[in-house]
Amino acid sequence: MRRLKVIMALGVLLSALGAVITASPALAGRGPQWQPPTPGGPPFTLPASYCGFKLRVAFPVNHEYTKVLHHADGSTTFLFTGAVTASYTNLQTGKAITVPENGPGKATIHADGSITEVHTGRNGPFILSPADATRFGLPTVSVDAGKLAFSVSAPPRVITSLSLHGHVLVDVCAALT
């Protein structure tokens, strides 16, 4: 009986060690200071003013790693990379789509509170107010491919510039209508 307990304890120890060794290359390949993914953010609902119906957004898969860099000028940069999957549901009809959004990105919050972001690859959900969607000629809710860059002023958080060198992969509202 004692031998069985020792064998079981060694088995548990080796399994735990195997899990650590298996996870290490994923973090090591990204270098130091990368934080492993946390569970996807909580689902949220956009009001009908965005799509003509209430839209539920959830993140069933989150394998996104983050690195936080603090700068001498008081700004903070967030680097992120990895796979995220978002699901979008029209709450009026129940129609839903799921979209992989695997693009890396960089967001800098400047000391004055303004924000600059650059995303490449597949990225989303990119959400604009109806007024900003009209101003920039983009859908209110989209998944995009290519380089998406934008700047936001310090509070009250007005988009001051936006460029998409790529294309809209999914106009979420149109896809769920």
Language-model features, listed with the residues they occupy:
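Bacterial N-terminal signal peptides that target proteins for export
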Residues: 1-10
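Functionally constrained cores in energy, signaling, and assembly domains
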Residues: 5, 15, 139
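C-terminal segment of classical bacterial N-terminal signal peptides
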Residues: 15-25
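Beta-strand-enriched cores of mature, soluble protein domains
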Residues: 29-177
